[in-house]
Amino acid sequence: MGYKIAVVGATGNVGREMLNILDERQFPVDTLAVLASRRSLGTEVSFGDKTLKTQDLDTFDFSGWDIALFAVGSDATKKYAPVAAKAGCLVIDNSSLYRYDPEIPLIVPEVNADAIEGYKNKMIIANPNCSTAQMVVALKPLHDRATIKRVVVSTYQSVSGAGKEGIDELWDQTKSIYNPVDNKPPKKFTKQIAFNVIPHIDVFMDDGSTKEEWKMVAETKKIVDKAIKVTATCVRVPVFVGHAESINIEFEDHLDEDEARDILRESPGVMVIDKREDGGYVTPIECVGDYATFISRIRQDSTIDNGLNLWCVSDNLRKGAALNAVQIAEVYVNRILSKR
């Protein structure tokens, strides 16, 4: 049996990746609509061996459609997601708009798939922030074993997390380094991103943290356990795709590195590559196009009781966005739609 699926924002980085993943995972699609704003109307996108033309989101009727995967900004989501939901179409939203609404589930299927039942509240399910998604996949199985008290995370986030404009800016600035006549000043980012790192993602909050850092705190609590203390420093780095995170974890109970490694090896969505030798770890460039969240550099933290350090890498356009959304859709099909 197939289902009627709409991809909203099909011409963007995440929207195109959603189409790729729907095809790769052989999602049971009966009818597929690719939607975009009027300025992108008629743009062609690929779905498997098919070429589809985008339709106008503004005039699209969601009645009779099963699932809409939203890959647009919060403003467009605010306008169109309620329309789709009211028509009886489940919205899986990749923006930040609904993540902190207590009535809307925030789901990472490897972690809290049971929260899918909350779809009944508003017919909307939220996708987490890219940096949160990969981290909680690593944290949850360890939390189940030894109960996490506190997490300290520093992120190394690629420019694709800022959209196509971020990718273009890194590319243009990198070229201009070798051609000073064609200087490219910052537009998307606050400072030059080429050959640089920027400790600033999203807007600053009153306490000195950034919105990106606040998101990691709030979302980890909502997805995993509200009792976990989290502090984050989020940094933009000159990498096109793939986010990395250095994570320090303090547990209630002792958990040695060997047991942690074994637990993670058996955990869904996780790939452990952790050899104590040159190259025995995963870097962002190696995770591009992969579904897994890669874990390396697992080791005890000798400065605290019950502490561990690890390195976490994932494709932010996949697990951090498009893949997670499709996985949520799979849970909805398997647990809800197929039972009707």
Specify the residue positions occupied by each region the protein language model found.
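N-terminal Rossmann-like NAD(P) cofactor-binding subdomain of oxidoreductases
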Residues: 1-193, 229, 293-294, 298-304, ...
